[in-house]
Amino acid sequence: MRQMQLEKPGGLDKFKLTEVDIPQPKEDEILIKVNASSLNYHDLMCALGLIPTDDGRVLLGDAAGEVTEVGSAVQNWQVGDQVMSACFPNWIDGPPRYEFLSFIGDNQDGYATEYIAIKETAVTKMPSKWS
């Protein structure tokens, strides 16, 4: 599959298209075929090096796609479900805490990829009338 990796923070010209294997979801993860993604301001700041991220990071925190595989412990999703990314994927409920405030695309790989294996709680159901 193809994915865009940021070779090194410092500008949008630092992206490179790479070929990697389709990831296998862990027991608490789902595999998503990414149908749409977008570059938002947070992603731009990571690409420019204004928000720290690792060399080789796969950016993009906004996406929509279809569940193509579910891990053995996944209970909330089925193959074929339409999902979209959540801004704070580690904040499930309750008051915000510092450890919840991580973004996909800066401290873990994001959606600039054809497929992503991600925790089942990192996405939400896409409204049926959205395309």
Predicted regions and their residues:
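Short structural boundary motif marking the start of a folded domain
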Residues: 1-4
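Short beta-strand/turn micro-motifs composed of small residues
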Residues: 7
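Short N-terminal binding/cap micro-motifs at the start of the first secondary-structure element
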Residues: 11-15, 41-43
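Well-ordered beta-strand positions in beta-sheet-rich domains
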Residues: 17-19, 115
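A short beta-to-alpha transition loop/helix N-cap that caps and shapes the active-site region
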Residues: 42, 90-95
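Short, compositionally biased
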Residues: 95-109
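A short glycine-rich beta-alpha junction/loop motif
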Residues: 115-123
